[in-house]
């Protein structure tokens, strides 16, 4: 699960993101020519496909992993024409699917594209209330997908969106007291599937941990107390990982501080010309940091 990124707001925002979807598609020959001119899409350089495709008992597995794969490629619309995107996706799917499931996947992709296009025509509904937006989105989905496909592609999102709409209705109800609103929202949360409930609680848990850590440090707490605090709030394994991250960050900061001192000495050397200073700084940075680390460096040097 990708957490609470699957939200009602995200579904509604899709209307505006897809309003400029091109009409029709280029021929396969045009798709091949465009792909040949510069690979697939610049924005995907250095990335791996998000999501995955799978089959079971000779049939396509329709789930959110497959939808994520569709969205990964469709995110390049604008950089690449739809025909190019479809051809590239088909090539990716051939690596994991046989002919039957592959045909199912491409048919599902075409309907997914149709669904996305249909949302563009409902952009005006963005001005209405969230519950109405949700109804429009779900009605559009029913026009393109079977119930089994809906459950696979959008199940968790629909459940969380319905929860969100009901929660907002409770919070907006002036007839309810603060305590009654809190009680009803808590009841709604208990109706969420365990995975969604845990995902909803996760950001709150980390915010609470960060606040507790800050109070502990302000009070003079040491590393052992910090570890005990973390283990009690997020578990021993997570506390171990956080401790390792702390050590890595401290080691990195020490390297940055050493670099700053040496850089200051170079800049203060009156015997060097401006060009010599720049060359010396470039050599120093190359000696101390890899190319990847150098990308992080400016943010720390500005402090």
UniProtKB/Swiss-Prot annotation:
GO (cellular component) term, any one: plasma membrane
Keyword terms: Cell inner membrane, Cell membrane, Chaperone, Lipid degradation, Lipid metabolism, Membrane, Transmembrane, Transmembrane helix
Domain of life assignment: Bacteria
Subcellular location: Cell inner membrane
Listed InterPro entries: Lipase_chaperone
Parts of the chain that traverse the membrane: 7-23
GO biological process, one term: lipid catabolic process
Gene Ontology molecular function: any one: unfolded protein binding
Protein family membership: Belongs to the lipase chaperone family.
This protein's name: Lipase chaperone
